[in-house]
């Protein structure tokens, strides 16, 4: 096979877009408790802001409850403040060196807005995937124009890039559908 574009590099970049999308939708609060809900929370600790998971252990003891075990007893109130200020709508209850965080039921309006946010994340990921596709296609056109690859090779590689793009976008749609079902499940 002649030179053209690095298909593996394009695949890596498309897989990166899927990974970012998975991370984005994992942070969306559904009806079930998940430690990922607290990923955006930062805590004022030891003179700087730190992610919550660097000062405490987060577990899910019940489907609608999170438990945060703070490692340093002096940090409990700072952790509580960080969770309250995170705009996640959570109200932690201090229980010794632990915090219990009951997750309120999501109302229909909130569920629909979360689905809309998930769709926005999906669209952002699809745009990133299309940019990768465009970079690949531009690389093929340049390689063909420069005489590095022939027209047949260029066409074959562009079909592979298009197939890879379609598969990656289908994966985004599949993940979005799963998340949408999870959010709307009462």
UniProtKB/Swiss-Prot annotation:
Name by which UniProt lists this protein: Ribosome-recycling factor
In alphabetical order, the GO MF annotations are: ribosomal large subunit binding
Gene3D superfamilies on file: 3.30.1360.40, Ribosome-recycling factor
A GO cellular component entry from the record: cytosol
Query: Hey, which family's this protein in?
Result: Belongs to the RRF family.
Q: Which gene encodes it?
A: frr
Q: Where in the cell is it found?
A: Cytoplasm
Work out whether the entry's keyword set contains Protein biosynthesis: yes
Q: Keywords in UniProt for this one?
A: Cytoplasm, Protein biosynthesis
Give the start-end ranges of region Disordered: 144-163
Organism phylogeny: Bacteria, Pseudomonadati, Pseudomonadota, Alphaproteobacteria, Hyphomicrobiales
SUPFAM superfamilies found in the cross-reference section:
Ribosome recycling factor, RRF
What GO biological process terms are annotated to this protein in UniProt? cytoplasmic translational termination
Protein task: Responsible for the release of ribosomes from messenger RNA at the termination of protein biosynthesis. May increase the efficiency of translation by recycling ribosomes from one round of translation to another.
Xref: InterPro entries? Ribosome_recyc_fac (IPR002661), Ribosome_recyc_fac_dom (IPR023584), RRF_sf (IPR036191)
């Amino acid at each position: 096979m002649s030179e053209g574009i690095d298909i593996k590099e394009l695949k890596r970049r498309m897989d990166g877009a899927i990974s970012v999308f998975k991370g984005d939708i994992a942070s969306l609060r559904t009806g079930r408790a998940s430690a990922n809900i607290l990923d955006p929370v930062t805590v004022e600790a030891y003179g700087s802001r730190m992610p919550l998971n660097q000062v405490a252990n987060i577990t899910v003891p019940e489907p609608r409850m999170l438990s945060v075990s703070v490692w340093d007893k002096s940090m409990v109130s700072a952790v509580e403040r960080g969770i309250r200020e995170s705009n996640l709508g959570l109200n932690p209850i201090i229980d010794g060196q632990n915090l219990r965080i009951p997750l309120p039921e999501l109302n229909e309006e909130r569920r629909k807005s979360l689905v809309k946010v998930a769709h926005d994340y999906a669209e952002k990921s699809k745009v990133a995937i299309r940019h990768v596709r465009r970079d690949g296609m531009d690389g093929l056109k340049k390689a063909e124009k420069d005489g590095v690859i022939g027209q047949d090779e260029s066409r074959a590689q562009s079909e592979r890039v298009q197939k890879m793009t379609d598969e990656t976008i289908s994966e985004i749609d599949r993940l979005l559908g799963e998340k949408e079902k999870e959010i709307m499940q009462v």
